[in-house]
Amino acid sequence: MIFAGKAPSNTSTLMKFYSLLLYSLLFSFPFLCHPLPLPSYLHHTINLTHSLLAASNPSLVNNCWLCISLSSSAYTAVPAVQTDWATSPISLHLRTSFNSPHLYPPEELIYFLDRSSKTSPDISHQQAAALLRTYLKNLSPYINSTPPIFGPLTTQTTIPVAAPLCISWQRPTGIPLGNLSPSRCSFTLHLRSPTTNINETIGAFQLHITDKPSINTDKLKNISSNYCLGRHLPCISLHPWLSSPCSSDSPPRPSSCLLIPSPENNSERLLVDTRRFLIHHENRTFPSTQLPHQSPLQPLTAAALAGSLGVWVQDTPFSTPSHLFTLHLQFCLAQGLFFLCGSSTYMCLPANWTGTCTLVFLTPKIQFANGTEELPVPLMTPTQQKRVIPLIPLMVGLGLSASTVALGTGIAGISTSVMTFRSLSNDFSASITDISQTLSVLQAQVDSLAAVVLQNRRGLDLLTAEKGGLCIFLNEECCFYLNQSGLVYDNIKKLKDRAQKLANQASNYAEPPWALSNWMSWVLPIVSPLIPIFLLLLFGPCIFRLVSQFIQNRIQAITNHSIRQMFLLTSPQYHPLPQDLPSA
């Protein structure tokens, strides 16, 4: 635990703390991996936390300790407020797979082509892409071609208060993400898998497409005539059962939606469009037409549509349908928002996911203590500190509770940006590069020193040739140099390759300036395990210190070894020459 932030105003308490800390650093923690100051990437979090405390509790912030855990998995989740469910943007990722790469000739699939496209349907992937362009021509602002990030970002996340809304999909087969406790969900929307297919005709072909999922409406209230009248459908064409063509002659029809029950009787309410999986944040004192236009892709849309969509084609009504391709829909949240499923957080929902999730903001585990408290530094002694400092969770200091979050008045400003992972990855790859360069210089010095020693040895052998050579002249065992520089250079090459790989990955994460809204999907590659990388980044300074100490010890050993060679001292690494003359 590292203590940072605003120090207590009591000077004697502060001096006593620093004295204990200095004593522990000098005598009890010789291998302390982290320096006294906090890592630079946590400075912004500490400053933001202090600002929030100053705004919510001024009497407390003037004399308190802020305590932040440096554990890579210790995070606290703050539930997203009601408006986040209706206004948070989503990025869409598409992937296709084929059972038969060349099932139909290209000329028969020309009906699926978007006429504005210049791509010729010469392979199945382009044929499927042409078909998708027909459906997705109105969704181009929301489609992201970069690979999404899967896998949990954190695995020990706690949520201290109940979230206003959760989404649950319990499939018999799927990718399990985790299940939130019912006590952490004020209301849960249950999704059910489709059991039928729908038919769609395009050109001369009859398509059979997997039907949409459904939402359990048993606990929803039908008040659409009062609150959703005038709410227009978004103009999208994601799927036949989501298509909503718009034109000047035929404006979109108003949608109908159901009320999500709220434990509090207030004017802010959530309504759900169960047909198009949209959440509307309504105020019952104002008509919905006065609210701004909402995005057609929302977190509920992502949860409902994240799956595999099979497409079969049929030449005639009497022929057997043949599988054309499978469309995999995957969605990712915007910066700062995360899906919390059980105790794990995700940026993206994989296709065919299963579990119970909600929207949250992430913050490191931050606590605070009264500035008059004496904070003991744990020493490595047989006795243990019996007195426990009363650390208060940050949410209590900010005045957050389950009711305030459910009402939508909770805080949504504290979040851990994924940019942290990118900067730490850059720093770690730079450290590895510096280590490899240092080892290269040291090995070059060792090779140069060995060449000098061998050259001196040859000179001494020439000077003592009349006496039978240096070894016979000294009447000692002869020593020879065993060159193992090749192994060192191989290890240096591995370090450089690893550093180059990390640098390439970090550069690939950087978002181009023309795609600022999609930079989060570049943060980490798909196959990189996030938790091990984060642990490596956390202990990078410790590894660098140990390697530096190893290099110093190695230099000292090589120097001593070279001196022994120069003064012809014995060494177990050298081999004696035979002293007897060979027999005739």
UniProtKB/Swiss-Prot annotation:
<keyword id="KW-0814">Transposable element</keyword>
<feature type="transmembrane region" description="Helical">
    <location>
        <begin position="524"/>
        <end position="544"/>
    </location>
</feature>
<feature type="short sequence motif" description="CKS-17">
    <location>
        <begin position="454"/>
        <end position="470"/>
    </location>
</feature>
<feature type="glycosylation site" description="N-linked (GlcNAc...) asparagine">
    <location>
        <position position="265"/>
    </location>
</feature>
<keyword id="KW-0732">Signal</keyword>
<feature type="glycosylation site" description="N-linked (GlcNAc...) asparagine">
    <location>
        <position position="370"/>
    </location>
</feature>
<feature type="glycosylation site" description="N-linked (GlcNAc...) asparagine">
    <location>
        <position position="47"/>
    </location>
</feature>
<dbReference type="InterPro" id="IPR018154">
    <property type="entry name" value="TLV/ENV_coat_polyprotein"/>
</dbReference>
<comment type="function">
    <text>Retroviral envelope proteins mediate receptor recognition and membrane fusion during early infection. Endogenous envelope proteins may have kept, lost or modified their original function during evolution. This endogenous envelope protein has lost its original fusogenic properties but has immunosuppressive properties in vivo.</text>
</comment>
<keyword id="KW-1133">Transmembrane helix</keyword>
<keyword id="KW-0895">ERV</keyword>
<feature type="short sequence motif" description="CX6CC">
    <location>
        <begin position="471"/>
        <end position="479"/>
    </location>
</feature>
<dbReference type="Pfam" id="PF00429">
    <property type="entry name" value="TLV_coat"/>
</dbReference>
<feature type="glycosylation site" description="N-linked (GlcNAc...) asparagine">
    <location>
        <position position="222"/>
    </location>
</feature>
<dbReference type="GO" id="GO:0005886">
    <property type="term" value="C:plasma membrane"/>
</dbReference>
<keyword id="KW-0472">Membrane</keyword>
<protein>
    <recommendedName>
        <fullName>HERV-H_2q24.3 provirus ancestral Env polyprotein</fullName>
    </recommendedName>
</protein>
<feature type="signal peptide">
    <location>
        <begin position="1"/>
        <end position="35"/>
    </location>
</feature>
<keyword id="KW-0165">Cleavage on pair of basic residues</keyword>
<keyword id="KW-0812">Transmembrane</keyword>
<feature type="glycosylation site" description="N-linked (GlcNAc...) asparagine">
    <location>
        <position position="283"/>
    </location>
</feature>
<comment type="similarity">
    <text>Belongs to the gamma type-C retroviral envelope protein family. HERV class-I H env subfamily.</text>
</comment>
<keyword id="KW-0946">Virion</keyword>
<keyword id="KW-1003">Cell membrane</keyword>
<keyword id="KW-1015">Disulfide bond</keyword>
<keyword id="KW-0261">Viral envelope protein</keyword>
<feature type="topological domain" description="Extracellular">
    <location>
        <begin position="36"/>
        <end position="523"/>
    </location>
</feature>
<feature type="region of interest" description="Fusion peptide">
    <location>
        <begin position="388"/>
        <end position="408"/>
    </location>
</feature>
<comment type="function">
    <text>SU mediates receptor recognition.</text>
</comment>
<keyword id="KW-0325">Glycoprotein</keyword>
<feature type="site" description="Cleavage">
    <location>
        <begin position="387"/>
        <end position="388"/>
    </location>
</feature>
<feature type="topological domain" description="Cytoplasmic">
    <location>
        <begin position="545"/>
        <end position="584"/>
    </location>
</feature>
<comment type="subunit">
    <text>The surface (SU) and transmembrane (TM) proteins form a heterodimer. SU and TM are attached by noncovalent interactions or by a labile interchain disulfide bond.</text>
</comment>
<feature type="glycosylation site" description="N-linked (GlcNAc...) asparagine">
    <location>
        <position position="199"/>
    </location>
</feature>
<feature type="disulfide bond">
    <location>
        <begin position="471"/>
        <end position="478"/>
    </location>
</feature>
<feature type="glycosylation site" description="N-linked (GlcNAc...) asparagine">
    <location>
        <position position="352"/>
    </location>
</feature>
<feature type="glycosylation site" description="N-linked (GlcNAc...) asparagine">
    <location>
        <position position="483"/>
    </location>
</feature>
<feature type="short sequence motif" description="CXXC">
    <location>
        <begin position="64"/>
        <end position="67"/>
    </location>
</feature>
